[in-house]
């Protein structure tokens, strides 16, 4: 939930809040919320050390105040003045610090992580945009206090004589369906085995008749067997539809992917086909809140999810909002799906903005948040809208001349909607002074299905020669075939370029790729043409994000590059100083006729707009900070074979003109053929030089 916070511009010295400061804030807050203080028993409850993320700070990231006597009302105060004062509150529900639901603990972890990322710098002088509103939406699920245990899980499978819990995704889904009391009956079926416990799950949804009238808003006290059966039937159907990986409470519960909700709602329960599942790191703060508020304004509860640092993903429902007294973004009402515990209003705005006022996402919380939009019964109307999203959008130049050409690119263009795309992509330039919008570079977009992406997407655009000088925000637009509208393609940030008649083109600063790794090794075996190199802890060493590819480079003994070879690896976009935790393997075969001698093999990285590859550096704690050195393997080529670290790799010879080549398996059966007139085919075919039995395929030539 580290989104851009709606703080007013201010000039002050930053300081942490003490418990005394927090108590003073609570005293003022309850004066305007009398239901919280009616028992006069609201007090501070410290958390045990294992309940929050280690912040390495003397002060608390937040302070929890609750009314234990009346069991009504709580307030959570932030631990730093740069965060909103009130992080969460409720006038109706309790907050037991000794029994915090996992979903709520996730939220508290996010608050603590935001607190830990606050710079000790004193100045909080910055200005941020806001999305203020005077409108409110009362909780749409008001009264619903469902959970994951009994009686909700009575039809869930058992494991080791213990009944599995429903799972937070299923409970949240059931709550939304209960809001609509729809459908009357399901459709389709499912048959699968769970990943963790290998439990066989089967369900024929066409036989499900949902008895909405028999379901209670809560099952805390008395209920009949009929009422219990009605809600447990719904819960199991929801879980099976998202292919729930069922587990017991002692195992940590049951889990499912949030993205599965969209297909389950539509395919098994006849919900609207215009639904979508959006990721937080694909939207700006303003867009994210605008979409979320619009859904709630339309009376549609929102299935929301986040990723915990300690125990995986969590799903719950946002079902209302009201104006915040201490933030320019609303307080959202959260139903945690935990028998009503801790339900209340919570801040989901950026709790720890960067010192420059900009929005950063290296923390990972933004990227882990998701929401399902458009959830409602099928209305039979195709609105032709597609939620197309990108990771960060970039331009190759920040200052350009009229009539010049630049590139607009992103690491990934994703279709977040259930319906596939069918149309074109355009670039718009919006003047920051008079909001004049110019549409250019309308190009075809290949069809993308639900959650499908096009990697390393780029467009070359020519700046109109007659466009007015000034600053322009660059955005993408999607034009659906058969419509007249250009729909916004969402991005977490939109680049700004300066256009002038006489100015020189200014490529983006430090445009070359600068990557490093902590260690590397040769992972291949001798006798195989395929060279495989593993990189450990690959890191982007500069502030600019890395979007591009990585390949092997053959150089002479002085380090001059001779050729690139092998697979082109395209890692996910790497943010400022981001580290890839998993080892990265790069492999391929060297082709050609090379003279005997000494050579080097480097690993090179190339950003999407970069013409040549930059050697990846080797960094280690023994090397002074800011100093890096290239790494490479020394290699010897002798009679068509390359020797690296005592291992031998046959080199695939160059294609000779007017010669046919065939790749064969060990039985000498031809499995691929190529000619000397199509050298590129050899490279495309490199990955099939292994036979089905895994052995090296033979290569022979035959004169025409």
Describe the residue ranges of each PLM region.
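Short beta-strand elements
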Residues: 482-518, 609-652
């Amino acid at each position: 939930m580290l989104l851009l916070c709606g703080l007013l511009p201010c000039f002050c010295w930053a300081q942490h809040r003490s418990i005394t400061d927090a108590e003073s804030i609570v005293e003022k807050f309850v004066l305007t919320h009398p239901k919280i203080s009616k028992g006069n028993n609201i007090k501070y409850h410290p958390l045990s050390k294992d309940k929050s993320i280690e912040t390495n700070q003397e002060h608390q990231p937040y302070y929890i105040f609750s009314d234990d006597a009346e069991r009504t009302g709580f307030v959570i105060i932030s631990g730093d003045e740069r965060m909103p004062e009130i992080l969460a509150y409720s006038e109706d529900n309790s907050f037991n610090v000794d029994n915090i639901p996992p979903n709520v603990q996730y939220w508290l972890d996010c608050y603590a992580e935001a607190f830990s990322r606050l710079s000790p710098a004193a100045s909080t002088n910055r200005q941020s945009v806001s999305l203020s509103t005077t409108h409110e939406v009362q909780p749409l699920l008001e009264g619903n206090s469902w959970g994951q245990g009994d009686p909700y899980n009575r039809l869930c499978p058992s494991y080791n004589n213990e009944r599995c819990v429903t799972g937070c995704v299923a409970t949240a889904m059931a709550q939304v369906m209960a809001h609509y009391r729809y459908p009357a009956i399901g459709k389709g079926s499912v048959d699968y085995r769970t990943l963790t416990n290998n439990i066989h799950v089967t369900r024929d949804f066409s036989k499900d008749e949902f008895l909405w009238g028999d379901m209670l808003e809560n099952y805390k006290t008395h209920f009949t067997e009929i009422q219990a059966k009605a809600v447990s039937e719904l819960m199991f159907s929801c879980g099976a539809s998202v292919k729930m990986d069922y587990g017991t409470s002692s195992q940590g519960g049951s889990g499912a992917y949030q993205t599965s909700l969209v297909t389950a709602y539509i395919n098994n329960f006849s919900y609207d086909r215009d639904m979508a599942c959006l990721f937080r790191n694909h939207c700006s703060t303003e867009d994210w809140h605008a979409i979320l508020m619009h859904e709630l304004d339309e009376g549609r509860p929102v299935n929301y999810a986040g990723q915990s640092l300690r125990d995986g993903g969590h799903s719950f429902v946002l079902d209302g909002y009201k104006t915040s007294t201490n933030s320019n973004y609303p307080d959202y009402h959260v139903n945690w799906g935990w028998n009503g515990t801790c339900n209340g209003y919570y801040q989901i705005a950026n709790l720890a903005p960067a010192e420059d006022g900009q929005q950063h996402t290296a923390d990972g919380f933004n990227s882990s948040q998701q929401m399902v939009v458009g959830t409602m019964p099928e209305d039979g109307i195709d609105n032709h809208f597609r939620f197309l999203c990108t990771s960060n959008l970039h331009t190759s130049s920040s200052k350009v001349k009229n009539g010049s050409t630049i590139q607009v690119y992103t690491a990934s263009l994703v279709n977040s909607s259930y319906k596939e795309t069918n149309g074109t992509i355009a670039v718009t330039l919006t003047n920051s002074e008079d909001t004049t919008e110019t549409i250019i570079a309308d190009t075809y977009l290949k069809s993308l299905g639900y959650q499908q992406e096009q990697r390393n997407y780029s467009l070359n655009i020519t700046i109109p020669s007659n466009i007015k000088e000034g600053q322009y925000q660059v955005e993408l637009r999607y034009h659906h075939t058969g419509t007249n509208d250009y729909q916004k393609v969402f991005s977490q940030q939109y680049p700004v370029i300066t256009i002038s008649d006489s100015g020189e083109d200014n490529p983006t600063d430090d445009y070359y790729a600068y990557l490093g790794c902590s260690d590397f090794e040769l992972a291949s075996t001798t006798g195989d043409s395929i060279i495989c190199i593993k990189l450990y802890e690959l890191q982007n060493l500069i502030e600019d994000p890395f979007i591009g590819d990585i390949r092997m480079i053959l150089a002479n003994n002085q380090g001059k590059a001779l050729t690139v070879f092998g697979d082109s690896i395209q890692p996910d976009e790497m943010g400022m100083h981001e580290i890839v935790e998993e080892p990265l393997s790069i492999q391929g075969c060297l082709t050609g006729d090379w003279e005997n001698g000494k050579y080097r093999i480097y690993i090179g990285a190339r950003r999407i707009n970069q013409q040549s590859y930059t050697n990846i550096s080797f960094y280690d704690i023994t090397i002074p900070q800011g100093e890096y050195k290239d790494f490479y393997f020394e290699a010897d080529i002798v009679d068509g074979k390359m020797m690296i670290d005592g291992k031998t790799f046959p080199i695939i010879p160059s294609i000779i003109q007017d010669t046919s080549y065939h790749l064969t398996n060990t039985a000498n059966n031809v499995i691929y053929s190529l000619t000397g007139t199509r050298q590129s085919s050899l490279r495309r075919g490199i990955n099939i030089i292994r036979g089905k039995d895994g052995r090296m395929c033979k290569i022979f030539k035959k004169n025409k």
